[in-house]
Design a protein with these regions (language model features):
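Peripheral, non-catalytic segments flanking oxidoreductase cores
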Residues: 1-322
Length: 322
């Protein structure tokens, strides 16, 4: 009797891709991965070990280990300092001390590609500021935002709707979230983050050497995410699913902790300031309209108030489904 092989998350080499020379087959490869898995690993491993550089400019070179080292003193700050990380937007501020998720602690930096956004966060955490932290986080956010923009443009081009990309790009805002998962004690749950889909357009996740992230396939398999060196997990969120008229898959994912090491993770989450519309080109006889136009941050608020927030349930369909 044979055994079915467990599927693997696609890995796509991105190191040599520039927005000006992206070819059709590469665009289709990215689109197909997001349609079938809802995610893929963007591999930039042509660079030196531990160093990521998506441009020709020195300031965009990032040493990932240095980024994670900078998170440790941040999370070591007193709780009364960390809770100053607030926002009127749902899931944009401090999250922690939750009885049903005792291992997780997280903070959000809004408008993370701008000096003002990062400075506002840093000044709230450190009374005298923290210039080194500021520079590192903003550089990281800028680098990953370029990856996000490239991926988004590739999908738009693959669907033949690239004419909408520039106007969409003008409405993008980036939230950077830093996350810390402590190892569980003997009697605690190993669940660091419950199964959920992201409410974003696109999410891009990295982690330190401690594993734990799992992604659920359409067939119900939980796949452990194995990051190649110098790679990013690119994941579609519910807003991307709706924009694509249900072509792109928004996958469930979770964190399950093992061992006795702390896990640090960074996510860049893309939101749209305004109304998201399904392109008319993506509506036809084979793909009847499944979603109405919707306000992205309105959807985030809707989800935050949904009593079914912790269930595997299509929240975006409830919000704006036809």
């Amino acid at each position: 009797m044979g055994f079915l092989a467990q599927p693997n998350i696609p890995v796509i080499k991105m190191a040599n891709m520039k927005q000006t020379i992206i070819n059709v087959s590469a665009c289709n490869e990215v689109r197909h991965a997001l349609e079938e898995y809802g995610c893929f690993l963007a591999d930039y491993s042509d660079d030196d070990d531990g160093i990521i550089n998506t441009t020709d400019h020195d300031e965009e070179i990032i040493n990932m280990m240095e980024v994670y080292d900078a998170l440790k003193p941040l999370f070591d700050l007193p709780i009364e300092t960390k809770v100053k990380n607030t926002s009127p937007k749902a899931y944009h501020g401090y999250v922690g001390q939750l009885p049903f998720l005792p291992l997780l602690e997280s903070m959000g930096i809004e408008n993370a590609t701008s000096a003002h956004g990062v400075n506002s966060f840093t000044n709230a955490m450190w009374s005298s500021g923290n210039t080194d932290f500021c520079k590192m986080i903003q550089s990281y956010a800028k680098l990953v935002s370029k990856i996000e923009e490239t991926v988004r443009k590739m999908v738009f081009e693959s669907y033949g709707v690239e004419k909408y990309h520039e106007s969409y790009n003008e409405s993008v805002t980036y939230l950077l979230r830093v996350m810390k998962y402590r190892p569980p004690s003997m009697k605690e749950t190993r669940i660091g983050s419950i199964s959920h889909t992201d409410k974003t357009f696109i999410s891009i996740l990295t982690q330190n050497q401690v594993k734990g992230l799992q992604v659920k396939t359409k067939d119900g398999y939980w796949i452990p995410v194995e990051y190649p060196p110098c790679s990013f997990l690119v994941m579609a969120g519910d807003a991307f699913k709706a924009w694509s008229n249900d072509r792109v898959h928004s996958p469930y994912h979770r964190v399950v902790m093992e061992g006795d090491e702390y896990r640090y993770s960074i996510g860049i989450f893309t939101y749209h300031k305004g109304i998201i519309q399904v392109p008319e080109e993506l509506v036809d006889e084979d793909h009847p309209r499944k979603f109405n136009s919707f306000d992205h941050f309105g959807y985030l608020d809707f989800y935050a108030k949904d009593s079914l927030f912790d269930k595997e349930y299509c929240h975006i369909n409830s919000y704006c489904g036809v």
